[in-house]
Amino acid sequence: MVNIRVQKAPESPRTMEVGEIDTRAPFQSVKAAVSLFGEVAVSKQRSTPRRSRLSSESVCDKETQLMLVHKEFMKIKQKLDNAESTRSRALDDLSKAKKTMEDLSNKLETVNKSKQSAIDTKETVQQREEQLEHDKCHGSPPHHHELDVAREQYISTTVELDAAKQQLNKIRQSFDSAMDFKATALNQAAEAQRALQVNSAKVNELSKEISDMKDAIHQLKLAAAQNLQEHANIVKEKDDLRECYRTAVEEAEKKLLVLRKEYEPELSRTLEAKLLETTSEIEVLREEMKKAHESEMNTVKIITNELNEATMRLQEAADDECSLRSLVNSLRMELEDLRREREELQQKEAERLEIEETKKLEALKQESLKLEQMKTEAIEARNEAANMNRKIESLKKETEAAMIAAEEAEKRLELVIREVEEAKSAEEKVREEMKMISQKQESKKQDEESSGSKIKITIQEFESLKRGAGETEAAIEKKLATIAAELEEINKRRAEADNKLEANLKAIEEMKQATELAQKSAESAEAAKRMVESELQRWRQQENVQLA
C-alpha cells in the first residue's frame, strides 16, 4: 500500500537528496485517503451483494421449480394410484368374469349331461318300443301298462329336453352378459395400461427434471462456496489494508516526532497544524472506515444469513430430491411389478382362452357328433315309421281278408243255418210222420183188436226208420258243432285283428310323435349349434380386436 501511495502522490518539484527525510503528508486530503482505502472495499462490497442477490434469486427460482415439480409429481402419483385402483377393479372384474365363465361351463356340462340322459332314455324307449313291436309280431298280448310307462318316460324326457333348452338359452344369455362384462374389464385394463404408460413417461420426464435440478443445485453449491471464498478473500484484503494503514500511520507519527525534534518551531507548528489536520482527517477517515466496516459487517451478516438460508434450502432440496428419487425408484419397481403381473395375466388369459377354445371346439365336435347321431336316429325313426306303415298296410290287408273270410263264414253260417232249419223242418216232418205212423199203428191195433185183424211192420223197416232219424239228428248236431267252432274261430280272429290294428295304430301314433320330437330336437340342436358357432365366431372377433 505504501508503493501505491507513493505512485499516486504527486511528485515534489525539488529533488530528493541522500539522507533527507520525506516530510510530505502521507495523504493530500481525506478524500484521497477515502478514495484510496475505500475503492477496493466499496467495489468488493458492491459486487458481493449483487452476487449474493443473484445467488438468492437463483435459489428462489430453483425452489419454486422444485415446488412445481413436487406438485406435478404428487399429481402423477395420484394418477398412478387411480390407475392402480382401476387395475385392481379390472382384475376383480376379470376374476368375476372367470367365475361366471366357470359357472357357465358347469351349467353347460349339466345341460349336456341332462341331454345325454334324455338321449339315453329316448334310446331305452325306442328299444322298448322295438321289443313291444317284436312281441306284437310274435303274437304276444300287448302290455298296456308298459306302454303307458314308456309313454310317460318319453314325455318326461321331452320335458327334460325342453328344460335343458331353456337352461341353455339362459346360459347363452348369461354368457353374453359375461362376455360384455369381460370386454368392459379388458377395456378398463387397457385404459389403466395406457395411463401407466403415460405416467411412466411423466415419471421419466420428472426424473430428468430432477437430475437437471440436481445439477443446478450442485452449481448453486459451487457458487455459494465460491462466494464464501471471495468473502474470505475480501475480509483478508481488508485486514491487510488495515494493517498497512496502521503501519503507515505509525510511520507518519514517527516521522512527525522526528520532524518536531529536528526542524524549527514554525515549521513544527505548521507541521503540527498539518498533523492536527491530518489527524482530524484520519479520525474522520477512521469514523468513515468504522461505518464502512459496520456496514460491511452488516452486509456480511446478511450474506451469511442468506447463505445459511440457501444452504438450508439446498439441504431441503437435497432431502426432497432423495425422497423423490426413492419415490421414483419405488414407482419404477411398482411399474415393473405391474408390467410383470400384466404380462403374467395376459399369458394366463391367453392360455385360459386357448383351453376354453379347445374345450368349446371339443364340445362343438361332440355336439356335431350328437347331431349326426340324432339325424341318424331320426332317419332310423322315419325308416321304422315307413316299416310300420308297411306293416299297417299288410295288417289292413289281413284285416280286409279276415273281414272277407268273416263275411264268407257268415254266408256259410247262414247257409248252414238254413240247412239246419231245413233239417229241423225235415226232422219235424219225420217226427210228425212218425207220430202219424204211430197213431195210425195204434188206430190199426185198436181196429185189429176190435176187429181182430193186425197190421204188421217188419223189423228192418222199423230199424231203417229209426236209423234215419238218428242219422239226421247226428248230422244236424255235427253241423251245428262245426258251425259253432267256425264262429268261435272267426270271432277270435276278428278280436285279434282288432287288437293288432288298435295296437299298431297306437304304435304308429307314438312313432309319429317320437319322430316329430326327434326332428324338433334335431332342429333345435342344429339351431343351438349354429348359435354357438356364431357366438364363438363373434367372441373370436372380439378377442382379435382387443388383442389388436
Swiss-Prot record:
Coiled coil keyword on record: yes
Keywords for the protein's UniProt record, in alphabetical order: Coiled coil
InterPro entries per the UniProt record, alphabetical: Web
Listed Basic and acidic residues bias regions: 430-448
The keyword rRNA-binding is assigned to this record: no
Residue ranges of the region described as Disordered: 430-455
Coiled-coil parts of chain: 71-544
PANTHER family listed in its UniProt record: HEAVY CHAIN, PUTATIVE, EXPRESSED-RELATED-RELATED, WEB FAMILY PROTEIN
Name listed for the protein in its UniProt record: WEB family protein At1g12150
Lineage start: Eukaryota, Viridiplantae, Streptophyta, Embryophyta, Tracheophyta
